[in-house]
Amino acid sequence: MYPAHLLVLLAVCVSLLGAASIPPQPLNLVQFSYLIQCANHGSRATWHYTDYGCYCGSGGSGTPVDELDRCCQTHDNCYGEAEKKGCYPKMLAYDYYCGGDGPYCRNIKKECQRFVCDCDVEAAKCFARAPYNDANWNIDTKKRCQ
């Protein structure tokens, strides 16, 4: 084998090892992102909701700072109920569609998928209704979320 071929093979192996260390994106969270965009008709990027208030994003504690943060708290609680039913809400895929007046779950027969889809659709619609206060994005949760 030629030295150049060995270098190419080594580069491919190193690339594959690097790719293997990237954690997979939970499918449901990708779907939830699409539901949010459907509900708010693309008026606000999904990432605006990932670090908002005390409950939007990973985890949550304390008193919600406003209506939008209460939507996130309700969504967190809904996922908690799904987990009590033995469901894996961040990993479940489900069938939905985006209509003119927002997202809907589509003919879901399996209990876990239906429950999680309902959690996500209700949260997305709640996000669309609630005012967004820029001052509540990226707050110091250690101070404000006791």
UniProtKB/Swiss-Prot annotation:
Q: Which GO terms describe its cellular component?
A: extracellular region
**Aminoacyl-tRNA synthetase as a keyword?**
no
What Pfam families does its record include? Phospholip_A2_1
Q: Kindly give the PROSITE patterns that the UniProt entry links to this protein.
A: PA2_ASP (PS00119), PA2_HIS (PS00118)
- This enzyme's EC code(s): 3.1.1.4
What are the subcellular locations of this protein?
A: Secreted
Point out the signal peptide segment: 1-19
- Catalytic residues as annotated in Swiss-Prot or TrEMBL: H75, D120
Q: Which reaction does it catalyse?
A: a 1,2-diacyl-sn-glycero-3-phosphocholine + H2O = a 1-acyl-sn-glycero-3-phosphocholine + a fatty acid + H(+)
Q: Which GO terms describe its molecular function?
A: calcium ion binding; calcium-dependent phospholipase A2 activity; phospholipid binding; toxin activity
Cofactor binding annotation: Binds 1 Ca(2+) ion.
What are the disulfide bonds? C38-C98, C54-C145, C56-C72, C71-C126, C78-C119, C87-C112, C105-C117
- Which GO terms of type biological process are on file? arachidonate secretion; lipid catabolic process; phospholipid metabolic process
Tissue specificity remark: Expressed by the venom gland.
Instruction: For this UniProt record, give its keywords in alphabetical order, as a comma-separated list.
Output: Calcium, Disulfide bond, Hemostasis impairing toxin, Hydrolase, Lipid degradation, Lipid metabolism, Metal-binding, Platelet aggregation inhibiting toxin, Secreted, Signal, Toxin
Q: Broadest EC class?
A: hydrolase
**What residues does Ca(2+) bind to?**
Y55, G57, G59, D76
**Which positions are cleaved off as the propeptide during maturation?**
20-27
What InterPro entries would the database entry show?
Answer: PLipase_A2 (IPR001211), PLipase_A2_Asp_AS (IPR033112), PLipase_A2_dom (IPR016090), PLipase_A2_dom_sf (IPR036444), PLipase_A2_His_AS (IPR033113)
Cofactor section: Ca(2+)
Q: Which family does it belong to?
A: Belongs to the phospholipase A2 family. Group I subfamily. D49 sub-subfamily.
Role, per record: Snake venom phospholipase A2 (PLA2) that inhibits collagen-induced platelet aggregation. PLA2 catalyzes the calcium-dependent hydrolysis of the 2-acyl groups in 3-sn-phosphoglycerides.
Which protein, by its recorded name, is this? Acidic phospholipase A2 S14-72F
What species is this protein from?
Austrelaps superbus (Lowland copperhead snake)
For this protein's source organism, the top of the classification is: Eukaryota, Metazoa, Chordata, Craniata, Vertebrata
